[in-house]
Regions:
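C-terminal interaction appendages of subunits in large macromolecular complexes
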Residues: 349-368, 383-388, 399, 403-405, ...
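Short, glycine/charged-enriched secondary-structure capping and boundary segments
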Residues: 36-38, 305, 404-407, 476-478
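Short conserved segment of the HATPase_c
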Residues: 33-53
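GHKL-family ATPase ATP-binding module
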Residues: 1-20, 24-26, 45, 49, ...
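Conserved ATPase-coupling elements of RecA-like P-loop NTPase cores
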Residues: 5-7, 32-36, 402, 474
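A generic structural signal for residues located within well-ordered alpha-helices
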Residues: 38-41, 70, 246, 434, ...
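Amphipathic alpha-helical segments in well-structured domains
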Residues: 39-43, 144, 475, 479
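Flexible beta-alpha connector loops of hexameric P-loop NTPases
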Residues: 31-37, 137, 240-246, 312, ...
Length: 607
């Protein structure tokens, strides 16, 4: 908040040994004066009192990411110890806090004495060093990549600032010695270019709009690609709003209105058979980032995922409409505007094809059921919250799964061959694909505008594929499909990856299944000598009883729930791994694959 409001330009985060972290800025420094009511320093108030952040003083910050004003005090409460150093007015101050255990209870964030003047300085700013409490965070360690991703995002959103991340942890604690510096002069324009780096844009530079009115700042960048899905990422006061809100609604409305007006004014829609262009046509292949800043933020719910301020919608719509109209009517923008309208007309033709296909399906009343005959082995349970759909690779494994399942709650949908790569396909091509038609019918939610989460027939959707390259590819294709066209299934926690065992250890009547090399090594040593070892190359090698016991039985199985921690990074990863460009994919593989990894099974068997 300090640097975002222009009171500093640099924040440096350092990860140190023993899971200690330090955060330093060159802002004004936390107030050190004695609070008139509480009779302690401003530093102590900020780090020990809830709702004491600067955002509750309207003169402190014009815009703040804090909704509840609890960040500093909660960090202190959840730390074994915390040290604050303030550099202000030529002086250096310091205060220490700790969380001792007294009579079996933790006293969190207790001051160790009062704020002390410890020296003179020419610096300004605040430095906080802390160690997360291991009594709360048992085995949690700072993840460099997660922190780096968030810092990169903040740097894109605040083009004037520099964010530095240092990894000074020793090697035995996972330290790398890396330093990452994030500073982007182009702001959101650079952000969109970063997201679209592995895509083919239909015009070179993103359209970048900035405006301010009534104390609200609006910053928008957008660029269209040859892809088929829209990707809109929105933020308010640097906080991601993955569920959108009034700022997204205003942006979409402005785009539809301005693009339509331009197309009509310049007589660009000459195909009379084409239905009227709508908002989703203009947003096909669009990547956009929307960032608004305002004082009194209203979120829907406590999780800050959806902006609720009603006044933001008309304001964003007005400002984006005005600036976008000005841009499109520049002589230099003529080719860009025409490409956007041409892309939208292609989307409208596809939409018309999809609509006609849906109408045809409705006329054939039993089409959905017909799609499933001989493919889906449904379950008898009538309550979706208890029902599970296993999407199983191959007929062989599908047959074993059908025999071994719990028929009351578990349905089986075998996949024959690899499904279509949806990242390279339009929606009408996807709907022509038999595997995806069957899957859509089985889930019951519909697709696109027809999608309704309340119609979901199975609250657990479990992808079961072999642990080889083909299995990994099938998982990636299915996850791409859910991310692109049924993202709500992921965000609501319905999509899982089944984890079949890699190995079977047997000694006489004793059998153990192992899910990774480390588990195999531990159990192998416990078994001693004279055991047999089997590696499962595919699900089809397991009989129905084995598949049930290891992979489908709710009491024994291991499932990984699919989540989206960062939508922009997920978008970029999918574009890299599943898109048309092979070079970024090759670079990703070279960076992340371990080509020197030893085959542990071969080592065990052959010594």
């Amino acid at each position: 908040d300090e640097v975002a409001n222009g009171y500093g330009n640099t924040v440096e985060i350092t990860l140190m040994g023993d899971n200690v972290a330090r955060v330093a800025d060159n802002g004004r420094g936390i107030p050190v004066d004695i609070h008139p009511k509480l009779k302690v320093s401003g530093v102590e108030v900020v780090f020990t009192q809830l709702h004491a952040g600067g955002k509750f003083n309207n003169d402190s910050y014009a815009y703040s990411g804090g909704l509840h004003g609890v960040g500093a005090s909660v960090t202190n409460a959840l730390s074994e110890w915390l040290t604050v150093e303030v550099f202000k007015d030529g002086n250096e101050y310091r205060q220490d806090f700790h969380s001792p255990e007294v009579n079996g209870k933790i006293k969190s964030g207790v001051p160790v004495g009062s704020l002390k003047l410890v020296g003179k300085t020419k610096k300004t700013g605040t430095q906080v060093t802390f160690k997360p409490d291991t009594r709360v965070f048992k085995n949690e360690k700072f993840n460099y990549q997660i922190i780096a991703t968030r810092l990169r995002e903040i740097a894109f959103l605040n083009k004037s600032i520099t964010l530095i991340l240092n990894d000074n942890r020793p090697e035995n604690e996972g330290g790398t010695g890396k330093q990452s510096v994030y500073h982007y002069e182009g702001g959101l324009s650079d952000f969109v270019s970063y997201i679209n780096a592995e895509k083919d844009a239909i015009y070179l530079k993103p359209i970048h709009i900035t405006a301010e009115q009534d104390g609200v700042q609006v910053d928008v960048a957008m660029q269209h690609t040859t892809g088929y899905t829209e990707n809109i990422f929105s933020f308010v006061n640097n906080i991601p709003t993955p569920d959108g809100g009034t700022h997204e609604i205003g942006f979409k409305s402005a785009c539809t209105k301005v693009f339509n007006a331009y197309a009509q004014k310049n007589n660009l829609i000459k195909d009379k058979k084409l239905s009227a262009l709508i908002g989703e046509d203009y947003r096909e292949g669009m990547t956009a980032v929307i960032s608004v800043r305002l004082k009194n933020v209203q979120f829907e719910g406590q999780t800050k995922t959806k902006l609720g301020n009603p006044e933001v919608k008309p304001l964003v719509e007005q400002l984006v409409s005005q600036k976008l109209d000005e841009f499109l009517n520049l002589k230099s923008s003529k080719s860009i505007a025409e490409k956007i309208v041409e892309k939208a007309m292609g989307a409208a033709r596809t939409r018309d094809n999809v609509r006609r296909a849906k109408e045809l399906s409705r006329q054939q009343k039993s089409i959905n059921n017909a799609n499933l005959v001989g493919k889906l082995a449904s379950c008898t349970g009538k309550k979706p919250e208890f029902n599970e759909l296993f999407i199983v690779e191959g007929d062989s494994a599908g047959g074993s799964a059908k025999q071994g399942r719990d028929r009351t709650t578990q349905a089986i949908l075998p996949l024959r061959g690899k499904p279509l790569n949806v990242e390279k396909s339009s929606i009408d091509k996807i709907l022509e694909n038999e595997e995806f038609r069957t899957l859509i019918s089985a889930l019951g939610t519909g697709l696109g505008d027809d999608f309704n989460i309340d119609d979901l027939k199975y609250h657990k959707i479990i992808i079961l594929a072999d642990a080889d390259q083909d299995g990994g590819h099938i998982r990636a294709i299915l996850l791409t499909f859910f991310f692109r066209y049924m993202r709500r299934l992921i965000t609501d926690g319905h999509v899982y990856i089944g984890m079949p065992p890699l190995y079977k250890l047997q000694k006489k009547d004793e059998v153990e299944y192992c899910y990774n090399d480390e588990e195999l090594e531990t159990k192998r040593q416990n078994f001693g000598r004279n055991y047999t070892l089997q590696r499962f190359k595919g699900l089809g090698e397991m009989n129905p009883e084995q598949l049930w016991e290891t992979t489908m039985n709710p009491y024994n199985r291991s499932l990984t729930r699919v989540t989206i921690e960062d939508a922009t990074e997920a978008e970029k990863s999918i574009s890299t791994l599943m898109g048309d460009k092979s070079e970024p994919r090759k670079e990703y593989i070279n960076e992340h694959a371990n080509f020197n990894r030893e085959d542990y099974f071969d080592k065990v068997v052959n010594g």
